[in-house]
Amino acid sequence: MPENLHFRSYDPDQTLLFPQRIDRDIPKDDPVRILKSVIESLDLSGFKKLYHERGRSPYHPKMMLMVILYSYMNNVYSCRKIEKLLYRDIYYIWLSGYQKPDFATINRFRNRVKNEIGHIFTLLVLILVEKGFVTLEVGYLDGTKIESKANKYTFVWRKSVERNCEKLLEKIRVLLQQINEQMAQDKAADVDTLELTPQTLCEISKEFKEALGSAPEAKTKEEKAAQRGKNKMFKELERHGEKLAEYNSRLEQMEGRNSISKTDPSATFMRMKEDAMCNGQTKPGYNLQISSENQFITDFALFPNPTDTLTFIPFLGSFPGRYGRFPKRVVADSGYGSEENYRFMDEAGIEGFVKYNRFHLEHRPRYKPDTFHPDSLYYNEEGDYYICPMGQRMSRTGTVQTRTEGGYISQSACYRAIRCKGCPLRCLCYKAKANQRTIRVNHRLNAYKRKACELLTSEEGIKERGRRCIEPEAVFGQMKSNMAYRRFRHMGKDKVVMDFTFFAIAFNIKKLCSMMRKVDKKGRKTSSYGKFVVIFICYMHKLEICQDKFEKMTA
């Protein structure tokens, strides 16, 4: 070993005469600084009502919010991992100001603010609007299925519950007949006219118990056997009443759905895209709907139904409640194209670039329309009749109403040909046994489809269709692949919504940081975080001063 070799001085236990700032080692352009400036500028006065004046002083909600959001930005969703990082990571130590809440405190804070965190998300989006990152004029809609925390074998099917409930009611009727034979005639229950509910069964079992208690003591062997039989029927009736109450509770929890999970009744069993066994197995989950703009999440909602068609109206209906108005333009795929949704957009004054189910098929280069399809037949609007390929007139015979799963009633006109027997094109026209072909046409839906086709094939429509592929799909890709948010970690819809709201806020802040660090044409950073933070804080300070002046003027 060389004698003149010198190492740098190393003393991990050395003490400093003057304490240094902990953020001296945090870069000025780090996302943690923009997160801190954004949260400090938000109005968290709504959190004050969630705390009590008495007792030990709680941790400041701004500190807790910053720590949780920074964890979500870095793919850390476990409260126990956050607790460890508060001891080890300099970024977390700086955000918390050397405070170290444990995992239970962090989890309690999330549950405490679950009704207020949605307002914070709205404030953040409005700040993005003020800064020009989003406009809320257009919404790119799409949905994805997120698996619930519940186990995949905790399923409860509606048909099974209804079938077992009918079998149980039949057992109860037979048991009540046996009880009537054992009880006095004046206390016997009329099984045929009696409404079998858990409450009535409880009353019957109570009367039966009183009758057993007032009976004389059994002495002989036959009397004791009869007494044991009565006690057995009494216990069996109680078990049937409890089981009937359980079945009724399951049906109430379903709320029109076909399945629920035992441990997470808000979740519905759906077929997920991630199917490892490739057998189409259903898993408990939620249908997550988002609206994005410039790859920022502007709105979201969770639904129990797996199809996107029924989520369109309630999802867009929540937009005015959050921002006070509808978006002027909506872009969505063919999963949302239905008469009910088109009519809603027409009445709300929304320009809808929404595809219908046959849009892609009709616009393929090699597409050849079916000559015998009702859409290809000639329609005389004045006479309200169709002409078949053989030139025969198809007159209108009536109107048929159909009800969708959401309760919407659509009307279809029926048209029937007069002479189809002996037609040389009959084998190509239709396959029914009847000698007269009948077609159903929804004129209102066809009008909406023509309007949607004109919008989608216009120059603006082609542009919007191209942007839709990189808007919500990019958000889902970042969420599932890069941020590892593929499954919910809570049970119950209220907690699941709370968890995703935290994620949506963290996602938007992370996207904001990414946009601020974009490289310009010369290869240099367009602006540093320091300049943006100063401008942002000054803007929010002036906004607070204006609000104070306005409150004094109106007081």
Predicted features, each with a name:
Residues 27-69:
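Basic, short loop/linker segments at the boundary and entry of helix-turn-helix/winged-helix-like folds
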Residues 3, 8-9, 68, 75-88, ...:
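Anion-binding and metal-coordination hotspots
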Residues 42-43, 72-75, 90:
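Short alpha-helix boundary/capping elements
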Residues 92-97:
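Secretory-pathway/luminal and periplasmic proteins that interact with or process carbohydrate-rich
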Residues 1-33:
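Hydrophobic alpha-helical membrane-insertion signals
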